[in-house]
Amino acid sequence: LVLGDRVEVCIPESKEPDIEPENIPLDILYEDEDILVIDKPSNMPIHPSINHYEHTLANGVLWYYSSQNIPYTFRCITRLDRDTTGVTLLAKHMLSASVLSKAMQQKQIQKEYLALCDGIISESGTINAPIYRAADSVIERCVDFEKGDSAITHFSREQTNGRISLVR
């Protein structure tokens, strides 16, 4: 190699995915060679799990790539609950997954939520309560002061109509 040469490294996917591709419409907000950004609708799980083997974001993304004959392993960086709608970040290969996962761990990627809540919520506040897996569930989480991981949520009320509040 000499100065100015360009080296391109291709790391092939190591195995076929266990997830079945499924033709599901995707709202792709952005895509480049490293990432895929999708607006995930509510009532759609991110990936297959107990009682939700089909109609997941992973099924749809695998269809999107398999229909283009592009090998792909599903690597979701910012997961959302099944009933939550919003922007989801996916890595397109092992290197971007590693970089983005590290950025998540170091809190360099910020997530922000909007929620409609019953009643009139305080104008702002902070919830500092440790979260742990709920008993008998692999998905649900609950406040657990003995075993929970640190979780801090800052919120502000954006609007209220006296019955419900829009909270950020």
Where are these regions (language model features)?
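RNA pseudouridine synthases
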Residues: 1-168
